[in-house]
Curated annotation (Swiss-Prot):
Name recorded for this polypeptide: Receptor homology region, transmembrane domain- and RING domain-containing protein 6
Organism: Arabidopsis thaliana
Its job: Involved in the trafficking of vacuolar proteins. May function as a sorting receptor for protein trafficking to the protein storage vacuole (PSV).
Residue ranges occupied by any PA domain in the UniProt entry: 70-143
Glycosylation sites per record: N121
Zinc finger (RING-type): 233-275
Length: 318
């Protein structure tokens, strides 16, 4: 639901950015109207174009205009208001240009007509041309030939319907990806929580550092104790070297201190070999997807490891 509202809001913002504006500015007056630029006239500058507005004579500008543009300062160019119909858009624009106007604002002659991009031959056309609705044109006509009123042409960003569709499609993809990631992470956390509950909160709880450091250690001398055949760390699968520090768990299994510290401090609090909890001395936890069904015996040469935690290793002495 939230994604739908985001998409709708994006479309509204894009539609506002894509439309250009015709704006009347005067003392205590500020009126703005949507317009569409012609496709054969120069594009309105980003900074906008402004000037004084006059009504064409004749109003349809299908013949040479009898009211020529006033020769004022170059900073106050003259714009002309023209009604649609009677001849082509191109003919209206060219007649306005011949009369010395710098821009032509054409308005629809019917209320129900939509704004379209006026078409024509761009050769020799150097003035701006825009189309507004009939309602906008009638309001603009009331403010023609008034020196205190200034007309400002504000360009749009020229976003086409295809661009809007592309942006909408990309937005939907991004929203879908975010939602998919959210539900994927949520599902993973739920599964992890269920797995922790299944193990009674012990098999995957992190061991406190102070308890870990309290377990005894010894320096490996290369001399095996009576009855001991372990010369390899079951975690990193490397042989012990003389001088290395080994940590001894309550179950009497030994490992590299670095390896077992990382193992027990990383959300695992059981012996990698016998699966006993070093804190409580509990027996092997119930079989699950993270613990094997059969624990290795003391005389076994095969060390079965957890499916997620350690690989299966077979060590053969020749």
């Amino acid at each position: 639901m939230n994604g739908s509202w985001i998409t709708i809001l994006s479309l509204l913002v894009i539609s506002q950015l894509a439309s250009s504006k015709v704006t009347l500015i005067g003392k205590n007056t500020f009126l703005s109207f949507d317009d569409v630029e012609a496709n054969f006239t120069p594009v309105v500058r980003r900074s906008g174009e402004y000037g004084l507005l006059y009504a064409a004579e004749p109003l349809d500008a299908c013949s040479y205009l009898t009211n020529m543009a006033e020769k004022g300062s170059k900073f106050r160019p003259s714009y002309v208001l023209i009604v649609r119909g009677g001849c082509s858009f191109e003919e209206k624009i060219r007649n306005a240009q011949e009369a010395g106007y710098k821009a032509a604002i054409v308005y629809n002659d019917r209320y129900e007509e939509l704004l379209v991009r006026m078409a024509g031959n761009s050769s020799g056309v150097y003035i701006h041309g825009v189309l507004v609705t009939r309602t906008s044109g009638e309001v603009l006509k009331e403010y023609t030939s008034r020196a205190e009123m200034e007309l400002l042409l504000i360009p749009g960003f020229g976003i086409s319907s295809w661009s809007i569709m592309a942006i909408t499609f990309v937005s939907l993809l991004v929203i879908s990806a975010v939602l998919a990631s959210y539900f994927s992470v949520r599902r993973h956390r739920i599964r992890q929580h269920v797995r922790d509950l299944h193990h009674g909160g012990q098999g995957h709880s992190r061991m406190p550092k102070d308890l870990l450091q309290s377990m005894p250690t010894e320096v490996y001398t290369g001399v095996l104790e009576e009855g001991s055949t372990s010369v390899t760390c079951a975690i990193c699968i490397d042989d012990y070297r003389v001088g290395e520090i080994l940590r001894i768990l309550p179950c009497k299994h030994k490992y590299h201190a670095v390896c077992i510290d990382s193992w027990l401090g990383r959300c695992r609090s059981f012996c990698p070999v016998c699966k006993q909890n070093p804190r409580t001395g509990n027996d092997v936890p119930p079989a699950s997807e993270t613990t094997p069904l059969i624990s290795p015996g003391p005389n076994s040469i095969t060390s079965l490891q957890s499916f997620y935690d350690l690989p299966i290793v077979v060590r053969v002495y020749l």
